[in-house]
């Protein structure tokens, strides 16, 4: 299933939300963390107005998430400048994932720091991460990643590298803030470059900050237009 299709499976039920996470979105014995966060964000959009751009998303992975997903979302506080919301993925009444989102309109600032693309890739440049069934994590089949600069994963680098990496999604829907969340978490940890062979690894907490105002990025699980999303780390 495409990400937009999984998001489209999110339906209201018993004061919360439910969705189905298929096997092709697994990361080991749990659902891919980026998908968990994207579903949580989609649920938060049920209680947070779409015109408030996402600023920060903080995720804590408490326990493995499998199969049917149940989500509870609520507003913690709606202030003049920002709105804080919380979403919990639950299983049998127990929290498996906790996500806090901060939303707010932009403000003028005397300190401006615009993110810049430090590398303009050529069409055939860089190393493309292969998807190897049985070896690669299942969710990786939905993303195509090309390393443009920095040491390769498992190359035995002596220090964490500075990566420039291009990520595209196989989704046929328009790029939404939910897609950005998934793409951001699909990027491998920088520490992998310091290893000499594949090894288990998992995140306990994860934070995403939106450095630019993307108020036009609204979750739209039913759209079908072709889009390509890119991310640079």
Report each predicted region and the residues it spans.
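Terminal targeting signals and extreme-terminal segments of soluble enzymes
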Residues: 1-233
């Amino acid at each position: 299933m495409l990400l937009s299709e999984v998001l489209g499976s999110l339906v209201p039920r018993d004061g919360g939300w439910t969705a189905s996470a298929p096997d092709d979105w697994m990361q080991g014995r749990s659902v891919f963390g980026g998908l968990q966060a994207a579903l949580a964000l989609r649920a938060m959009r049920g209680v947070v107005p779409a015109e408030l751009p996402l600023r920060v998303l903080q995720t804590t992975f408490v326990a493995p998430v499998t199969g049917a997903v149940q989500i509870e979302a609520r507003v913690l506080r709606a202030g003049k400048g920002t709105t804080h919301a919380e979403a919990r993925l639950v299983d049998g009444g127990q929290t498996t994932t906790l996500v806090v989102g901060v939303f707010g309109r932009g403000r003028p600032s005397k300190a401006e720091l615009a993110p810049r693309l430090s590398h303009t890739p050529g069409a055939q440049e860089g190393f493309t991460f292969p998807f190897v069934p049985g070896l690669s994590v299942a969710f990786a089949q939905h993303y195509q990643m090309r390393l443009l600069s920095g040491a390769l994963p498992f190359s035995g680098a002596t220090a964490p590298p500075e990566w420039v990496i291009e990520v595209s999604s196989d989704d046929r829907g328009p790029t939404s803030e939910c897609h950005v969340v998934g793409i951001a978490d699909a990027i491998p940890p920088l520490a992998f470059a310091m290893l000499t062979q594949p090894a288990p690894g998992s995140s306990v907490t994860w934070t995403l900050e939106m450095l630019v105002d993307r108020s036009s990025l609204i979750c739209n699980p039913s759209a079908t237009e072709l889009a390509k999303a890119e991310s640079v780390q």
